[in-house]
Amino acid sequence: MQNQKWIDEMGSAEGAAAAIAPAVRALFAKGGAGRVAFTAQEAVAAGDASALRIGETAGIEEVYAALNQAAQDGARPRAVHVAGVGAFAVSAQADKAGTRLAGRIALVTGGAQGFGEGIARELAAAGATVVVADLNLALAEQVAAALDAAHGAGTAAAMKVDVGDETSVEALVRGIVLRFGGLDLLVSNAGVLRAGGLEEMTLKDFEFVTRINYTAFFLMTKYAARPMKIQARFDPDRTGDIVQINSKSGLEGSNKNFAYAGGKFGGIGLVQSFAKELVEHRIKVNAICPGNYYEGPLWSDPVKGLFVQYLKAGKVPGAKTVQDVYDFYVAKVPMRRGCSPADVAKAIAYCVEQTYETGQAIPVTGGQNMLK
């Protein structure tokens, strides 16, 4: 039965659960690799001496105090029962061998294709639990199933999200917290592009690109930071990471591509500002600025890919075919190839592994864009 005090304080018993689960994970699933699964069913198995039961309380801080005291007393419960909210099953897994990514809970938006799919694949290979979030749920489910098949059941989960819609973003993060107990890494990757000059660009397209590439990063950070803050409060050894997949167009303006470049420039401003705000919670915020991923659908889609869009928009002087556009862009890269998901994943791994950089925009462009 839901307790009215939780509804008054947290909006709902489920909202309270989303605030409690990260604390339970931080205190009792030590080492960073553990999970906590929530169920609204309040009953805890009879005779389970390891279960921690918290009765009627005045609010969330009293629950936090009870959890903290139990941890200080050496309790290691397999389940935590909070009256009026539900039960939290604790799975305190040992850290997997490898990098700091091993055993962490990672969220990749736009994870069903392109860079996002490749990033999800690399994170899973590094031992992370990966939430593949995308507007296209069916495609996200295919990616998650492939990751489970490659790395074992429970490696990945698919969830639907519209990153430009606040209600959808809040529901996504809450769903992750209730299923896994928290969140360690956000890779804000979802993005769109509409090429065109001043006369071709419509206000509708400009606002759409801005909503997905700029506003959505604010929304994702706002809600993803919440469980990270709670985890950091109760586990002094835990850090969180937020990584925006930006672009080389966030470092240098792009001809007849101002909607995209403007949002990416703004994204770096958000990265720097969020980094200053969240550092006290041990949350690092950085951006990766990849070069062009020519093999991905953003560029190669035969109907709406950038090669086609740029050809139609006349971005490449004298270009008559898609191959002409391709050759033009590859010639700009000193390493003579496009950026791959593996290149980006290595940069993400660096962001997570290192402990002294935040607010940075890291070029991964094959030498095309160099810091000045």
What feature does the model see in each segment?
Residues M1-A106, G118:
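Glycine-rich flexible loops
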Residues G197-L198, D205-E207, Y329:
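Substrate-binding pocket helix/loop in short-chain dehydrogenase/reductase
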Residues E199, E252-F258, E280, R336:
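Active-site loop immediately N-terminal to the catalytic Tyr-X3-Lys motif
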Residues T221, G263, V271:
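Active-site helix of classical SDR
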Residues R226, K276-E277:
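Alpha-helical segment proximal to the catalytic Tyr-Lys
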Residues S247:
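Residue(s) in the substrate-gating loop at a strand-loop-helix junction
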Residues R337-V364, N369:
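C-terminal substrate-recognition "lid" of short-chain dehydrogenase/reductases
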